Amino acid sequence: MSESRAADAHILSVSIVAGPSAGAWLQQIGLSRKQRRLILPRGALSADANHALEQISAIADQGKVDHLVVECDSATPAMAYASLFLSPPLTDIARLATTVLAIRASDLLNLLVRRVASPELGSPCFIAEQLELVDHVVLGGAKDDPDLKLARNISIALNPRAQVSDLSSETAGRLLDNTESMSFDFGAALDGSGWRQLIDGEKRPHNGGNAIASFAYRARRPFHPQRFWTLLQGGLPSVFRAKGFFWLATRMELVGGLNLAGSELHCAAAGQWWAARDDHARQHEMPERTRKEWHEPFGDRRQAIAFMGLDFDADAFKEQLDDCLLTDSEMSAGPGSWATLSDPFPSWTAHSHTHECDHDHEAGDHECCHH
């Protein structure tokens, strides 16, 4: 046992590897000269916190492993496993070092850009959300594969904080041999996705790099439900990722959450606007970031959606979104009149919140959109 291992009192370092190519990448890993490594193949580690604790405790107690590599099953996101390491008792015996998503460049483009469905790859939103939260993205493909450059640029747009590399035995060995100096940062993962940075104003709108364009759409008046619905039903063919929240004129109480990746689009309730809550809740529970966004007479109600697209005219698309907003005459009619507007969106309830947006709708540090 190494001195550093003894100093850590048998704290086990753990890496989580997810994605359609996770198994292929892990097969390339050879023996490590730096540490004793154990790979748990897909489905071997339970996503149930209590069962996972028992499994990892048994491995740690044996004292024969320095580094545990967990391959996610196709139905469980990497963050579901990562969240197990947020608090004791698991943090007393194991430390999450890093998270990895492995996928072929062509598969990523098929899901997000070419919109080619594949049951083996999973849903576009599932893959996009995993990519946005990991530390490392590993792309498969030949070195002369034209898909590699575009897939790399899309990965960086989705997750600016991630290290993007090729799927090779050298990459695997180099990454997993240095876990002693790594520590997965949950806060950075939640705040570091490209869409989140765009909405928060921490990432500048981007144009270039294989014709990728990104921007955050913001407005302080509601969408006409029928016009916005019609725009969305067009499929937004040039957009490969969109996420954020929106305000429908007919729904003054509830936040609309939008989540698009490739051809997959979800719109659902994402909590309640703070402006629709009572004075006591706003005074004592409303987050500071929401207070900074507050504007009378409608409070925190607004549009804030990040869009990323390929070969599309961002300015023209912004005009399309502007056309979905209420006109001056519609605005002057007031909320009573807005309630009678045609609204083809499915009905929402406050309890149908599915974490589709980044809206501070509860007290504390709960964050939407981070599964």
PLM region descriptions:
Residues 231-234, 317-325:
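Short amphipathic alpha-helices in soluble, non-transmembrane regions
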Residues 92, 96-110, 117:
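Long, charge-dense
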Residues 1-51, 67, 71-72, 77:
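Glycine-rich P-loop/Walker A and Walker A-like loops and their local beta1-loop-alpha1 context
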Residues 15-19, 40-41, 69-73, 100-104, ...:
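Conserved beta-strand segments of the P-loop GTPase G domain that flank and frequently precede/overlap
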Residues 45, 108, 116-297, 331-371:
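C-terminal accessory "lid"/substrate-recognition subdomains
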